[in-house]
């Protein structure tokens, strides 16, 4: 057991952790030359296209060190994007150490700082590695200083390497074997294993990735899932290297998969403890905190026949992604669907794309909202995540919106633009630290403003150099109103928004203008209005298409022309009373893209 090392890699987006993982796999002979491809571990098509890691993946490699001992390296790849921090905390719970990979040209970024603190809090040994040393703009001394100043770990002897060219990678492995502690645990004790991840396979049922703390598990054992109390027979155990490879057993300290023919999707929840049926009173391992969704949006199938398939697809996805939550809801405009909770906008986009790709569904998404806290005049407090569920304003004593504490790391030359952006988003500055060439500013921002387009705007005002990390802080009273959209004097519930009163007029005007471009012209005028309560704050009209009824009158009396025009007018009026307007999918998304 002293020859096992469990570790994961912490890095910001695009600092090269998936490429470094490829090098490890290549050096330890996990795959033949023919099977080797870039970013082996990013197995989802979506991950390859966007060039980001979404799910945590695990690999077991055997590395023969210079001292002649062969070490078993269990390596768990983690995502770097702020929306997927919970995936990172799960991976870290299964490790004894972490590699902090920093791009030697760009330096430390906010996301790696946040993940690094998580690792240190969980008592992991953090080992800094400078990547991309082959680039001309690499400046190792500045970056080492940044690591020490911002994160506060000693980086004087950080290993320098380049994952792309393969330079220094063996040095990284040698250092890893030396600095990261071996797992503790006892093979003779009763089985205790932590579920790091699970996913649903149509043939095998639930496949769980586990880290064994104590004891051992082999094929034919009866295992007990602590939270459900159900017993299952183990069909097979094994490791990924990176292909599925069955082994005789999994022993204390190892990371691998267990297949036990669990057909119920919620049969092996992530973060749960497994043990043998003979020792049911083993302590539950400390899991990791369930992260609450920050953003809610309605998802509706375009055709109502897909509703059942949609429900099934959501169930399978929740198994694999424990942070996704959903409840059924119905809308007058869109029919039946689900109200889903996500961690952020990227998470929402990715879930929607996975549903459309992997399960062939056509979906309509409504505008995302956050949870508001309302104090009613009766004295009770309620939480609302859907603008159409907002009670009557006369019954509300106080409305509070969620505030996030955002930490932004930005080079000094872009600081001014970032501050302007934060003020525009109603932010309040908390503090500012100058660290070498970078500045760390922290702001209290309304989550409503952060959720929609803050990340994209931040990247564009800082030319891509600023990085962001945020977490929920508190609820705070705010002057909020509900903005309704009326089309031909009928409210469309799926387009309602909750906005700050100061921005309401501007938002209403922008929204009606945008709708005007997207709603196709009909045979009658379509009035688009934005209203706060009973007061209309903005209006535009989509003009009717009309036939030239005077084409057949050459000259002739004016009363003849008037008769034809009056007749057309009466027809249009009648049409407007019975006609209904089809609202295209783009119109629902327009709410997101209000500049």
UniProtKB/Swiss-Prot annotation:
InterPro entries named in the record: EF-4, EFG_III/V, EFG_V-like, EFTu-like_2, LepA_C_sf, LepA_CTD, LepA_IV, P-loop_NTPase
One Pfam assignment: GTP_EFTU_D2
Residues noted as binding GTP in the record, renumbered to the chain: 14-19, 131-134
Keywords: Cell inner membrane, Cell membrane, GTP-binding, Hydrolase, Membrane, Nucleotide-binding, Protein biosynthesis
Membrane topology: Peripheral membrane protein
Record's keyword annotation contains tRNA processing: no
The tr-type G domain, residue ranges: 2-184
Subcellular location: Cell inner membrane
Keyword Repeat found: no
Enzyme Commission number, as recorded: 3.6.5.n1
One Gene Ontology CC term in the entry: plasma membrane
Catalytic activity: GTP + H2O = GDP + phosphate + H(+)
Chief location: membrane
Gene Ontology molecular-function annotations: GTP binding; GTPase activity; guanosine tetraphosphate binding; ribosome binding; translation elongation factor activity
GO biological process: positive regulation of translation
Family recorded in the similarity comment: Belongs to the TRAFAC class translation factor GTPase superfamily. Classic translation factor GTPase family. LepA subfamily.
Its job: Required for accurate and efficient protein synthesis under certain stress conditions. May act as a fidelity factor of the translation reaction, by catalyzing a one-codon backward translocation of tRNAs on improperly translocated ribosomes. Back-translocation proceeds from a post-translocation (POST) complex to a pre-translocation (PRE) complex, thus giving elongation factor G a second chance to translocate the tRNAs correctly. Binds to ribosomes in a GTP-dependent manner.
Name by which UniProt lists this protein: Elongation factor 4
Organism expressing this protein natively: Pseudomonas savastanoi pv. phaseolicola (strain 1448A / Race 6)
